[in-house]
Amino acid sequence: MYAVFQSGGKQHRVSEGHVVRLEKLELATGSTVEFDSVLMIVNGEDIKIGTPVVTGAKVVAEVVSQGRGEKVKIVKFRRRKHSRKQQGHRQWFTEVKITGIQA
């Protein structure tokens, strides 16, 4: 059984026990979160596709950790002018473990 849900403008395909990195959620470590925007649920041959969401379905998860991702370097370079600009960015994330899918 797996489900596709939406969080932070992205869609995630998960099943029970998966650990997923999402955009940062303002939640404490160890707390429980429910995602109501479930787009699809597949249970063997039984497929439920939402229009746009499956009514009454939710994905339940537990917050494992909060953190920052790998550094992405941004470089702007102008030729022949000894001019360059360098910047780095680390995106915040929330790591959650899927504890249940309810249809």
Curated annotation (Swiss-Prot):
GO terms for cellular component: cytoplasm; ribonucleoprotein complex; ribosome. Keywords: Ribonucleoprotein, Ribosomal protein, RNA-binding, rRNA-binding. The keyword Ribosomal protein applies. Signal peptide: none annotated. One of its GO terms (biological process) is translation. InterPro entries: bL21-like (IPR028909), bL21-like_sf (IPR036164), Ribosomal_bL21 (IPR001787), Ribosomal_bL21_CS (IPR018258). The keyword Cytoplasm does not apply. NCBIfam families: L21. Belongs to the bacterial ribosomal protein bL21 family. This protein binds to 23S rRNA in the presence of protein L20. PANTHER family: 50S RIBOSOMAL PROTEIN L21, LARGE RIBOSOMAL SUBUNIT PROTEIN BL21M. Part of the 50S ribosomal subunit. Contacts protein L20. This is Large ribosomal subunit protein bL21. It comes from Histophilus somni (strain 2336). The lineage of its organism: Bacteria, Pseudomonadati, Pseudomonadota, Gammaproteobacteria, Pasteurellales. The gene is rplU.
